[in-house]
């Protein structure tokens, strides 16, 4: 097997919030693959960094009364702690706010400019006259230009699913200051992705992608041969902005989505300086090294269009492949702060749960596709307890004690030629291939089938019975030796997923650190094992319940900690006064939710079937998926606007509107709450 040179990255977490278990899916997926490559003997480097630039970081720092750099330094420490706790083995974890990143961003930009791929244009945007800043899409709210829903963001409507330009919003306001924004023009810098050179390159490059879903999506974005469907990419932002100023353009800054992926290279360049590696030999056009990016499917567009085109035309190698994964749900629903399933990495550790439990469970669910992954908490408990404790660790616990007490910890060398060893070793190529292809769930099914075979062997030999009869001493010695050698081989296969547990196994077995070549070795009587101590405890449901409660309490603490300037809860300004006749036009009715389901293709909408006492049901779409699991709403009473004209939406006809309460600034005061009448109310009652 020839040695490969491999550079691996995961997406960079944004430096204005904590790491949660949804993030951890990606870092665990990447780390398993990286650890496997290292075990195979390949020169592999895994780098990451905090994504530190942009308006949200600048505004959050201002809100906290600190500088952006003070904020990103604190968040970096928190993120690094979380990755260390979950055994994510970065070779270098850095920051996009670095000298290396500034230098590389300027180099890429100037090369693109030299190639004629940078254009300057006037762009009209919303401008906050109070904060004296241009407003990103997500910092503008207003009425949807399609359905009229209030408090919708500047790029899409959570009610009807429409997408639009911020300047299309009706009655817009700044989320930052509350002021009415004005339209203002400024010069912006664009990467000309629509250039025929980019299109030709991308059509060729798309054939290298490993995932059919990614290839199909890219071909959809590229359109048919001869079509011009690619849009140029705005790579600049106006001051004030926390980031890198564009060379030769005072007051203009690189958009965060330009400097963030370049941050992969900046982190690696920093590592190269520490290790004495030749950076250019890894990233130049003619490099023979491999380069892989693990990402979420929501940022596939940036990593399969902009990023490879930027690299290609700035004199760098392009990615060998981009691997995208799906989103995490918990118990079949989107992670929810109100249900306690929006679980932070730190809360998981603080509650006393073993990070390797989650590493194993995610691995048992992960494959090479972009399909979403569900953390079913009951299944999590059952699978960890069954597979890791009941099957894997149980092998050592049932045999090691006899070997230490009766045979000074020394195995019977001759017994290790047992046919069971052949079965375990013959599986190595298949397991290696599955790890390589990121088919972790299939790899673990194979490993657990082998564990079943080993446990069946132990059950047949019954060392606990053999130990009662001195005449069976040799048979006892052989049985325990075979069981522990099989356990060692299983440990090799599980090491990419359970690095901490396997490190303790290596110490207990008194062996060198396991790598893939160790499959061809075996335990030796010349190196006696150490006394056995427990390697892993079972998951207790009380721990999981405590974790959910801790995250519910964290939400409440966040809400309680957001006061207005006068010490009372912050609320948005009251609407203009209306006459009683205006209110009388609105027909509010009590409605019973008789059915509810998530809307395929939307991560915001739920589809509700409502009984409003008419003898028939109504279909209503509501943007409350982030707060409620469908099954939790069925049977509840709520309040709806019953005389709202039906409107055709992307996903079907909506025949009313369910009322829900939320704060004006949902990021500062998270939470979404449907109205629920007291007991005694019945469907069809009018709210007056």
Swiss-Prot record:
Domain called tRNA-binding: residue spans: 582-688
Cofactor list: Zn(2+)
Segments carrying motif 'HIGH' region: 13-23
Pfam families with a match to the protein in the record: Anticodon_3 (PF19303), tRNA-synt_1g (PF09334), tRNA_bind (PF01588)
Positions with a binding annotation for ATP: 337
Single GO BP term: methionyl-tRNA aminoacylation
Chief subcellular location: cytoplasm
Source organism superkingdom: Bacteria
Keyword field contains Ligase: yes
Keyword Metal-binding: yes
Motif 'KMSKS' region, residue range(s) on this chain: 334-338
Residues binding Zn(2+): 144, 147, 157, 160
Enzyme class: ligase
Catalytic activity: tRNA(Met) + L-methionine + ATP = L-methionyl-tRNA(Met) + AMP + diphosphate
Gene Ontology terms, MF aspect: ATP binding; metal ion binding; methionine-tRNA ligase activity; tRNA binding
Compartment(s) of residence: Cytoplasm
Cofactor binding summary note: Binds 1 zinc ion per subunit.
Gene3D superfamilies: HUPs, Isoleucyl-tRNA Synthetase, Domain 1, Methionyl-tRNA synthetase, Zn-domain, Nucleic acid-binding proteins
Database matches in NCBIfam families: metG (TIGR00398), metG_C_term (TIGR00399), PRK00133.1 (NF001100)
HAMAP family referenced in this protein's UniProt entry, alphabetically: Met_tRNA_synth_type1
Cited function: Is required not only for elongation of protein synthesis but also for the initiation of all mRNA translation through initiator tRNA(fMet) aminoacylation.
Protein known as: Methionine--tRNA ligase
Native source organism of the sequence: Ralstonia nicotianae (strain ATCC BAA-1114 / GMI1000)
